[in-house]
Amino acid sequence: MAVMTYAQAAALALAEAMRADPAVVALGEDLGRGGVFGQYRGLQQEFGADRVIDTPISEANIMGAAVGMALAGLRPVVEMRVVDFALCAIDEIVNQAAKNRFMFGGQGRVPLVMRLPIGIWSASAAQHSQSLEAWFAHIPGLVVVTPATPQDNYSLLKASLASGDPVVYMEHKELWGVEGEEIGRASCRERVCVPV
């Protein structure tokens, strides 16, 4: 067990999931250089550019590709720079990822994790600082997760990655540097620590 920050806990959970399951992939802007806030640092070097995928700046295309990957058997993790940009991909999130299971009688599951950083942060403009968790919670078919502590961020990200449903995973930007309790990895059985 180790004391780590909120951001480090999520990075550890994602790295462990990628080591355990080759179907877990990550895609988004600038992930190869570690992500906008450093939360993907070192992952492309470890897993390669075909599993940590740098994308063009087109949120609708990123999300559409991730929905297709999920339907084809992968477990994509989509990184949006901020939650506000997810609104550029709202059709893919609301009408495709969230509804697929219902449209195809449970046969079209979309095991997708959308990491959407929320909240105000130093030098962020108004269109980079929203908290839309309540809005997403009103969309049938989406699971909304907002971890509060480093242990939450570790356990809930692993549980989200194991879920068969699309998960809107909202980390508050102001929490990334917060150190927390020791991360209890030994208590996690298989890939799930806390069900979502």
Regions found by a protein language model. Name each.
Residues 1-168, 174-175, 180:
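Thiamine diphosphate
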Residues 181-185:
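A short, charged helix-loop
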Residues 186, 190-196:
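Single conserved hydrophobic/aromatic residue that forms the stacking wall/gate
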